[in-house]
Amino acid sequence: MEQNEIYAALPGVLLPWYEKNARDLPWRHTKEPYRVWVSEIMLQQTRVEAVIGYYERFMEAFPTVQALAEADEARVLKLWEGLGYYSRARNLQKTAKLLTETQNGAFPDTAEALEKLPGIGAYTAGAVASICFEQPAAAVDGNVLRIIMRMTADDRPIDLPQVKKEIGEALCKVYPKGRCGAFTQALMELGACVCTPKSPKCEVCPTQSFCRAYKTGNVTKYPVKRPKAVKKTEERTVLLLECNGRFAVEKRSETGLLAGLWQFPNVPQKLDAQTAVQTAQSFHTDPKELVLETHKTHIFTHIRWEMTGYVIRCNAMSEAFTWASLAELERDFALPTAFRQFSDELKTL
């Protein structure tokens, strides 16, 4: 079977398979652009199982574009807490405000127009355009790339922009009229549940009869990726300063990693216990007791933090920080996961 014939065969086998095997996910109950868009943004870099609860809480808090546009940013970030990549949440609100101000909350119906909105790339634009507006717009992510590279036995690295572009263009040509949304979701479902990175379920795959990688017994050889750069490791010391049941927190810079989020005071180096107490003293907290030393690790996309935390009881609440109880930290402050793991441990003190 020629490559163009493989693409052409996809709708015929995937659509019936999807109708029988689609998972029941909350964002699949609607074609409302707002809800589909929020789900697609949340699903970037995040497992479906983890997203469901976040999605339902987010929709309860902000049921419309207008509600999100009018929300306090701190509330948006708090509901996003734990999903990571917080720029996604900020861009959601930017787009909501833009659509509310210029389009009365309505979404454009083409991938090209959607891609001009903050935080919406080619994949999300294709997903919303096809699912909500039945446009023949491909949504090509890692799942879809893996499917196509295996079916066509293409050994080019999938992180080459040209590869993604070519696959998107080829898929757009075979989108079935009136079933564009179902076809997009069928591809997503196949990649998530059957054509998985490891241990693919080839025996139940609807594309088995024309998958070149399956026929040659080389499924897990594909897709090919260029070697990843080694993650940089950074040592950090986190000061968990406590005074009368309240803990010191501060806001990070509005630019860079974890921009604008709350954190426990910290320094980008490993300090011994004595130096950590001296550092706490320099913040005018009058430290009186080192209670606990603890160690945590957090891995970002490009960097690994090795963190040493010191719980230090203090006599004074320095004005350099905001001081909050554990209950307030839980309820009101958007703490990134890197720091949240320390607050969880503080509950045991």
What are these regions, as identified by a protein language model?
Residues M1-D24, H29, A192-L349:
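Intrinsically disordered, low-complexity, charged terminal extensions of DNA damage-control enzymes
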Residues E2-E203, T207-T216, T220, H284:
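Catalytic cores of DNA base-excision repair glycosylases
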